[in-house]
């Protein structure tokens, strides 16, 4: 029988990527190169009084081709840190501003 040799190294088991967050919001600024500022809205019911409370936060997102403009409704996906404050990237423009 011939002596069979295996690979010189064992490839590391591929880890599945974690679920990435997605968000939909409106572009409020496009004055930076390849970056847009998107306002994300969250609505929650107050635990005691039941009133719907609107909270907003602004996030910076990477727009490689500079396609999005102010007022556009866009879809974002979380990604690795691209700069000190940029952690999202533009997936698609859902609706252009009128």
Swiss-Prot record:
Alphabetized UniProt keyword annotations: Isopeptide bond, Ribonucleoprotein, Ribosomal protein, RNA-binding, rRNA-binding, Ubl conjugation
A Pfam match: Ribosomal_S17
Purpose: One of the primary rRNA binding proteins, it binds specifically to the 5'-end of 16S ribosomal RNA.
GO CC annotation terms, alphabetical: cytosolic small ribosomal subunit
Entries under CDD domains matching the protein: Ribosomal_uS17
Organism superkingdom: Bacteria
Similarity-based family: Belongs to the universal ribosomal protein uS17 family.
GO molecular function terms noted in the UniProt entry: rRNA binding; structural constituent of ribosome
Isoglutamyl lysine isopeptide (Lys-Gln) (interchain with Q-Cter in protein Pup) cross-link, renumbered residues: 96
GO terms for biological process, alphabetical: translation
InterPro entries for this protein: NA-bd_OB-fold, Ribosomal_uS17, Ribosomal_uS17_bact/chlr, Ribosomal_uS17_CS
Gene3D superfamilies cross-referenced by the UniProt entry: Nucleic acid-binding proteins (2.40.50.140)
Disulphide bonds in the chain: none
NCBIfam families recorded: PRK05610.1, uS17_bact
Subunit structure: Part of the 30S ribosomal subunit.
UniProt name for this protein: Small ribosomal subunit protein uS17
Organism whose genome encodes this protein: Mycolicibacterium smegmatis (strain ATCC 700084 / mc(2)155) (Mycobacterium smegmatis)
Region (Disordered): 1-21
């Amino acid at each position: 029988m011939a002596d069979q040799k295996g690979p010189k190294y064992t490839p590391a088991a591929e880890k599945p990527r974690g679920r990435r967050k997605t968000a939909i919001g409106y572009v409020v600024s496009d004055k930076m190169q390849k970056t847009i500022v998107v306002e994300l809205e969250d609505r929650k019911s107050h635990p005691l009084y039941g009133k719907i409370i609107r909270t907003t936060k602004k996030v910076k997102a990477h727009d490689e081709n500079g396609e999005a403009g102010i007022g556009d409704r866009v879809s974002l996906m979380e990604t690795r840190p691209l700069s000190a404050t940029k952690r999202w990237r533009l997936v698609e423009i859902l609706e252009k501003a009128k």
